[in-house]
């Protein structure tokens, strides 16, 4: 009898998975074509979470099991799969996975269902998603996930302007100051040292929960300004190059400013990019 019940449960799970694949295949087709390989893999892994959060599952009817076992629904099976997949994703990359889930849900929802601008709707979805997944799966999701998403376009632009000294310093676009009186027995400051000081001071004034976003903006500004040939170890497509520059910026700013930057800052570990790339630009 136990073998019979287990076989029926396995059949129910198989049916639920088949329903999930049928439901998701159409919605994910277009978005996956635009995703990078690492993102596509994460999106595939998080399909059960997308299906569950959209409530695209319905109870399975198994009347002959009423007296034997508790009725399992396809929603319960998909919920279990979602939590299982999320638990297998390293903590430092869960933010990235959740971002992908939110984008997939918003792309599949008709625009008429949102009564507010899409960006605000995305922030609201992120908050709801974090609450649901944390409670539903009893799993740790970094707090920075939500806080990073609450920055609007204007705030991001302000952050980028605020950290212009960091962009300048990391690009090594500063040169020693010519001092007419070198005989003075004092270490002569250079423009690089001045810019470094300004960078660290500005970064320390940014709240901890927003430093990740600020560094992302700095790295993106550097990547856009530098010719592709100046980066060794950066190849197409663009996304790995951006992630590598974020990682380089993190390393430089952590050691240079002696300031706290959340460990979860980059989600780029999914792409297996080396920790260090060689920069061939000028030096101070």
From Swiss-Prot:
Residues 1-18 form the signal peptide. Keywords: Disulfide bond, Seed storage protein, Signal, Storage protein. The keyword Signal applies. Contains disulfide bonds. One of its GO terms (molecular function) is nutrient reservoir activity. Pfam families: Gliadin. InterPro entries: Bifun_inhib/LTP/seed_sf, Bifunc_inhib/LTP/seed_store, Glia_glutenin. Seed storage protein. Might be integrated via inter-chain disulfide bonds within the glutenin polymer. Belongs to the prolamin family. This is Avenin-like b9. It comes from Triticum aestivum. The lineage of its organism: Eukaryota, Viridiplantae, Streptophyta, Embryophyta, Tracheophyta.
